[in-house]
Amino acid sequence: MFDDDSEVERKGKPRHLLGIADEESIRHAVTRGIDTLDSCYPTRVARHGTVLTKDGPLKMRSGKYSKAFGVKIDESCTCPTCQQYDRAYLWHLFKAHEPLAVTLAAQHNIHYMNEMMRGIREDIMENKI
């Protein structure tokens, strides 16, 4: 999908990829010359009870988080969700079908993706990509 540029003549124009999803796909696309992208991935997975972390996605509806009091969603995250709430509370919100669960998970996921993209931009500026 990203490897064949033979039919695409760039002429200095940016290349946009619509609907790219997960972190691995984004990194792959960037290394193949994609300049811009958009995605509903962070909010879509939040609606299904998943939060994104540096250690991989967490399915917050899992009972293993029911007693995770005092444990941040992602220990290194600086988003408002991680600063104010723990995994047990987010688990409770999802189990109780509270709309706030999706709001908090989406807020976290968007922050996570923004930080990931910041890192990719820094890698590009430092010629690591």
Q: What do the PLM-derived regions correspond to, one by one?
A:
Residues 74-129:
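C-terminal extensions of enzymes
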Residues 1-73:
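Glycine-rich phosphate/ribose-binding loops and adjacent secondary-structure elements
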